[in-house]
Every structure is written in C-alpha cells, then in structure tokens.
C-alpha cells in the first residue's frame, strides 16, 4: 500500500482498482460531478461488510503490512468471490477509486464505543462536502451541512446531525427509537494515522466474531457468528444457522463455503486457546 493514496492514486493501485470496478458495475456518469459520485457510491455499496477475509489475513499474513488488503485485492475479491471488507479496507479502496477518477477526498475517523475504530471519506466538490461511508452501508453521499439530513434505507432511516468542532453524529431511526451509532470527525487524518488505526483494528473485540452485513431490496442482512437477522419494513426475523453456516452465508452473500470455513476454523482455534490451561498450571479452578 503506497503512501500517496490521497494525492497519487497510482501509488495505491487506484487506477487499476477503478478499471476492475468499472468493468463490473459500469456506473453511469462522466467526470467528477455529484451524479457520478452517487453512481459510484451506489454501485460500491454492493460490496458487503464482512470480516471473514480480515480474520483469515490476521492469522495467515507473514507481517503486519501483509495483512492489509489493497484496493485491487478488495475489488477483485468481490468480482471473484463476492467478498468485501471492513470499514478500513472498504474506505481505503473507495478512496483510491474516487481519487483516480478525479474526486478530491480524504479519510476521516469516527468514534463508536471506542475512539477511532470506524472510518469514512469526506469528498469535497463545488464548495460543499459530502460524507461517504462504505463501511456503514449508507449507500449514497450525505452532505455535511448546518442542518440535519435524513436518508431512507431499506432497514432504517439514517440521520446525520451536526454537532460542533467539525463533528457530526450519525443515528438510525426505527419506529420511535433513535440510536446513536457514531460521531465522525471530519478533519482529515494523515496516511500514517489512518494506517495506524487500521493496524490497531486487528486487535479489536469484533475480530473475535464473524460479522457480515449487507443491504438488499428486502432489507438488512446481519450475521454474527451463527446468528442471522433479517430486518425489513415488516420487522425482524432471527435465525440460528449454526448447522449450515457455510451454506447459508453462501446463499445470502454469495461467499464460497471454503472462505467461511477457513475463518471459522481460525476463530475456533483461538477460542480453544482461551480455554487451554496455562503451561505449568493446573487446569481446575
């Protein structure tokens, strides 16, 4: 991964990733205009949020640098295997594609339950700024303005509210409930800072669970380990898919059973290591 992603798209494989992306989706639009941005972001939302590939890379990479999946690998992974990535790889990839297409964009960090564990992009265009968040499946650019903005999705209404000091809060609205999801800080972060947070994300608790999510015309699919939730206009349906996990993920996400099985095996070994008694110590409590 080259250090020049945000000012030299060739350093980050941006041009090559863009060619693969355009060949797969053929989004409408021409130059760096708002409608083109919407088309690219909408097409890119087909890539699912999933940490299967990240889990596999965590346990198989030869070095910390090798575990970061670059833009070509992310797009090629979707074309070949219907995989996607987590917020860092999805953001890095989309940022490089947009930069290579002539858009001015930079990475930003967001706070969830912990600081700086989520990320997104800010795109600048015609004296306006837009939040683009491929890791939260919003599916379209959202203008960063002085007034709150609401976006309708198939599973909830997403609301972005200005706060203070270059911060915006993102909520989801379902029925009468408003849930805070994160606070995004729109000040640009350096390439080095972005990569550092990306590397640190491999140690987050979420990496101890298989997580997948994507939007469909019917609603929102969410998998955590062997629990599947489908959330749509008619409500929620929960299902335990432990007995046919690999088959169901293949059916719902198109991801090959071998990929799910490999991630599952790595986590199973990790959990067995937690239960194993320390060397030289009795196993009983």
Go through the PLM ranges and name each one:
Residues 9-82:
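Secondary-structure boundary elements
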Residues 70-81, 110-125, 129-131, 156-183:
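N-terminal short leaders/motifs
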């Amino acid at each position: 991964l080259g250090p020049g992603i945000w000012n030299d798209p060739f350093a980050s494989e941006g041009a090559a990733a863009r060619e693969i992306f355009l060949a797969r989706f053929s989004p409408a639009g021409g130059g760096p205009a708002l409608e083109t941005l919407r088309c690219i972001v909408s097409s890119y939302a087909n890539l699912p949020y999933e940490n299967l590939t990240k889990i596999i890379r965590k346990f198989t990479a030869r070095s910390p640098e090798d575990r970061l999946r670059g833009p070509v690998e992310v797009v090629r992974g979707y074309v070949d295997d219907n995989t996607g990535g987590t917020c860092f790889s999805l953001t890095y990839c989309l940022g490089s594609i947009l930069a290579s297409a002539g858009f001015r964009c930079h990475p930003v960090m967001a706070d969830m339950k912990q600081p700086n564990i989520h990320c997104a992009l800010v795109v600048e265009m015609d004296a306006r700024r837009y939040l683009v968040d491929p890791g939260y499946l919003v599916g379209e650019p959202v203008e960063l303005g002085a007034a709150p903005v609401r976006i309708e999705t198939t599973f909830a209404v997403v609301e972005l509210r200005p706060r203070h000091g270059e911060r915006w809060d993102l909520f989801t609205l379902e029925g009468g409930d408003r849930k805070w999801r994160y606070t995004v800080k729109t000040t640009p972060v350096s390439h080095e800072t972005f990569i550092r947070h990306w590397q640190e994300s491999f140690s987050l608790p979420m990496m101890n669970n298989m997580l997948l999510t994507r939007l469909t015309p019917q609603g929102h699919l969410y998998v955590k380990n062997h629990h599947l939730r489908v959330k749509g206009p008619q409500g929620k349906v929960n299902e335990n898919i432990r007995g046919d996990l690999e088959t169901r993920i293949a059916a719902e996400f198109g991801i090959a059973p071998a990929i799910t099985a490999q991630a599952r095996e790595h986590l199973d070994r990790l959990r067995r290591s937690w239960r194993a008694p320390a060397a030289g110590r009795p196993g009983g409590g």
